[in-house]
Amino acid sequence: AALTTAQVVALETRDLVALGTAAVRALNTADIVALTTAQVGALTTTQIAALTTGQVAALETADLVALGSSQLAAFTTAQIAALTTAQVGVIETRDLVALGTAAVRALETADIAALGSAQVAAFTTTQIAALTTAQVVALETRDLVALGTAAVRALNTADIVALTTSQVGALTTTQVAALTTSQIAALETTDVAALGSSQLAAFTTAQSAARTTSEVGALDTRDLVAVGTAAVRALET
């Protein structure tokens, strides 16, 4: 900790990686800010995991970009939670998919909202399934529509219930057609009312049969006429 920031910056990467975890934790935030991208990129996974939450929050966005997938995967849940929205926003997709489910759940809702569409689309189905309902609600509509059909199907019923009417109304016809029957049954009546004619027309017969009576009752007449004959026949008596 007695090293000046100038001395820290002067450390060669081979010398920096030789530091023990206690020595790494002894670096103050000014030292962390001063580290070059080459120095940060050279840190071992053990050193990364040893960083304090204050040190993690002090990493510059360029330094986050310099981290590899294995380094990002070494972050603890506390470290992930300490990341700023600016830091989360620059994480490369190849590194984002390296995060474990616990790490994904540690992302704050503000961080989820800060993610770009490409980042959200890169999430694996396992990561999507691990999201909390609060995180799912925090997804911006433009990011939600970037999800592939497998990712949409990975949302659990609690997530579907938690979706806002704006989010449901923004789903593409392809995404709507990919919903499981359990997900369809979990849609709230206000969400069903938010669906447009083209979205309702995308429902499969199995999905139509899975609708609850409350959901059917929430359909607008203009949307009902968009439903195909097979879908109408699938409605339970």
Each model region followed by its residue ranges:
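General marker for long, soluble alpha-helical cores
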Residues: 1-237
